[in-house]
Amino acid sequence: MNIKDFTTGIQHIGIPTNNIEETINFYLTLGFTTALRTINGTEEVAFLQLHNLVIETYQNRQAAMAYGAIDHIAIDVKNIDELFKVVQRKKKK
């Protein structure tokens, strides 16, 4: 089985920020809604949604403040345990 057989779409895109309130307000003006606000450790986190696009922004005060400063892209998958085994087998090749 190939890795692509497990993927179902993008889960979210992670973007760090130095000022979460300004970042949230920016995305709200673009039509996003706040799906969730929480705290992860010491970092404030917000999930912002526009249709099927979800952005996770979190305040870590270490954001690069440069174009393309995306921290991560999360992919939805089915059967993550089986996918993990497939990835491990591919790493051994």
Q: What spans do the regions from the language model cover?
A:
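N-terminal beta-strand motif that seeds the catalytic metal site of vicinal oxygen chelate
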Residues: 1-21, 70-73
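Vicinal oxygen chelate
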Residues: 1-6, 17-20, 37, 47, 73-93
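Core segments of cupin and vicinal oxygen chelate
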Residues: 7, 15-54
